[in-house]
Design a protein with these regions (language model features):
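Post-signal peptide N-terminal segment of mature Sec-exported envelope proteins
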Residues: 36-61
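Predominantly extracellular/luminal regions of secreted and cell-surface proteins
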Residues: 117-142
Length: 579
């Protein structure tokens, strides 16, 4: 994705005229769905029980036992190399301390490993991008679905900013709101108005947006719970709430131009009791190979067992932060005293550097893709890179991970960016990758348009099917058959073959989100570039209902029981009720 593209505004589409009659959007949708084969359809809707182990020492994988493990070659000055996967050449890496000094042999004091995504947090809600370390969520709880309709429950006006040649209204990619049902001790400690502090059902919306403000709202009503935190410079990505229920927010700055005023890049740490920033990581970093750009679009993961935050950056570094956090609810105080190390790396095709997607974690193994198309795996404990493969183009979409009896796999897709700029193939590649080896299992290609301002291809994170959908993974592909159009398709996890493919009249950068209902069924939500939110049946891809959010909605929604929250280019945050 281009780092400072002109943002295109889409006209509102509240109603259309079809056959001389004014009809609702849903009634005259021109989207078409083409069904395919479904040979691996599950016979049961049950999801196997997951391990609840959270001890990093027990979860950690012995790196030398991994299939195809190759010992690193020592190159001197703390630099190490390993061979690329399925192509010639080597990649290298180095680890730096917070004073930009090379660490010759990084030997951390403790192991860092994540458990099953159900163990990422005990706090109800959606606390990071797609909810957990596998990035397979985005929805919490179950919705009581009766009418299969959507209804706007509340709206919160928000602002905009402009930069040189760019316009940023409302919220955009990835822009997922955070929804958190605070523990009582945290709720009481934050200095909220009594009607929220004393309400056991209170759930808060925490939403960093383009205008450089963090909004805090009541999920039920949209009412402000505290004044917005204003850092002056815009957020593009998604923040993270501390998974222990501590009143700490972590969020990266995606824009440094506020109406002509240029500011510093920072990854920001917020104390939600004081309602202010208390620490930050500068984006322009001497250890980086990309010295001119310092944005942070990634949504951090926090390992609550070891008090460790991990955040990839657009400067090409990966930051590992020992938070040294303390929370005293009785004293109404929270503090951090961070210590950090930084991972720098490059592969044979590295030129641009920078990571815009959010890291995925399986035990002590972590995964990301970068602007040069490098998909790689590193160890969260030692920060050594274990394997790397090149996907052929920029990958901004966060991948999703699944552990199965057959292995551990990643689902990922790239966009048409670098190849389009150099006259190369204008194809988006969707892949299934073996997470332990980096080997490709299958690939599905879709032609997509190139535009340096608005990329085509995969920008949204795929939705991984579970239960009755466990044979499919759903991808959203932008700008396929025409510059304004797109496709959403369900692929068979085993083969990569199409289960269904839905042509979308208006393309989407938003991530499709699956939620559970009390009736035992699953439903899907996706938004598009004309501001339409679609409630669809993930079994078939067909719409059940739609509603207009005014303008382009490229942010990804979050869902808490019957409430959906997302903001659009119409400069509003919406609370939408599932009826």
């Amino acid at each position: 994705m281009r780092q400072s593209r002109p943002t295109r505004r889409r006209g509102a589409l509240a109603a259309l005229v079809c056959g001389g009659m004014l009809l609702s959007v849903a009634a005259c949708s021109t989207d078409t769905v083409a069904p395919g084969e479904r040979p691996n359809k599950p016979t049961s809707s049950q999801t196997p029980p997951a391990s609840q182990e959270t001890d990093p020492a027990k979860l950690s994988i012995d790196l030398s036992s991994m299939p195809g493990f190759v010992p690193a070659t020592v190159k001197g000055n703390g630099r190490y190399e390993r061979p690329m996967t399925d192509e010639p050449g080597n990649f290298w890496w180095q680890v730096f301390n917070q004073d930009d000094k090379v660490i010759e042999q990084y030997q951390p004091k403790e192991k860092v490993a994540f458990g099953d995504p159900s163990t990422y947090t005990d706090v109800p809600g959606v606390l990071t991008f797609r909810g957990n370390n596998y990035r397979n969520g985005g929805a919490y709880g179950k919705a009581d679905v009766k009418e299969k309709k959507l209804e706007i429950a509340w709206e919160k006006p928000i602002g905009e900013i402009r930069g040189e040649g760019s316009y940023w209204p409302g919220a955009g990619w990835t822009g997922q709101p955070l929804l958190v049902h605070w523990p009582e001790a945290t709720r009481q400690a934050m200095g909220l108005p009594a009607k929220f502090a004393n309400d056991p059902n209170f759930t808060e919306v925490i939403y960093p947006v383009f205008e450089g403000k963090v909004y805090r709202l009541d999920l039920a009503t949209g009412e402000s719970t505290k004044d917005p935190i204003d850092v002056k410079f815009g957020f593009k990505g998604t923040g993270s709430i501390d998974p222990r229920g501590y009143p700490l927010l972590y969020s990266g700055q995606g824009l440094n131009d506020r109406n002509g005023t240029i500011g510093p890049w920072r990854y920001r740490f917020f104390d939600l009791i004081q309602n202010k920033e208390v620490w930050g990581i500068p984006g322009l970093d001497a250890s980086s190979l990309r010295h001119e750009w310092g944005a942070f679009d990634s949504s951090a993961l926090v390992n609550r067992q070891t008090d460790t935050l991990i955040e990839p950056a657009e400067n090409g570094l990966i930051y590992k932060v020992k938070l040294n956090s303390r929370f005293d609810p009785a004293a109404k105080k929270v503090s951090i005293n961070p210590e950090l190390v930084k991972l720098a790396y490059a592969g044979p095709q590295s030129e641009k550097h920078g990571i815009e997607n959010s890291a995925v974690a399986y035990r002590n193994l972590m995964f990301a893709d970068d602007n040069d198309g490098n998909l790689f795996c590193w160890d969260a404990t030692t920060m050594q890179i274990l394997w790397m493969r090149n996907t052929g183009d920029d990958v901004d979409s966060t991948m999703v991970l699944e552990e199965t009896p057959d292995g551990v796999f990643l689902y990922t897709g790239n966009e048409v960016d670098n190849r389009g700029a150099t006259g190369g193939e204008r194809i988006s590649n969707i892949r299934k990758i073996d997470a332990l080896t980096g080997r490709q299992v299958w690939q599905h290609d879709i032609p997509a348009y190139y535009d340096p301002a608005v990329n085509g291809g995969v920008l949204g994170t795929p939705a991984i099917g579970q239960g009755s959908l466990s044979d499919m993974v759903i991808f959203n592909v932008a700008r396929t058959t025409a510059p304004r159009e797109g496709d959403m398709l369900a692929l068979d996890k085993k083969t990569g073959q199409v289960i269904w493919r839905r042509h979308m009249t208006n393309y989407s950068w938003s991530s499709p989100t699956i939620f559970q209902a009390t009736d035992g069924n699953q439903y899907g939500i996706v938004t598009d570039s004309d501001g339409i939110m679609h409630l669809f049946d993930p079994q078939t891809g067909e719409d059940l209902s739609t509603i207009s959010l005014g303008k382009n909605t490229e942010a990804s929604p979050s869902i808490y029981n019957n409430m959906i929250v997302v903001a659009s280019y119409d400069k509003k945050i919406f609370g939408i009720k599932i009826k």
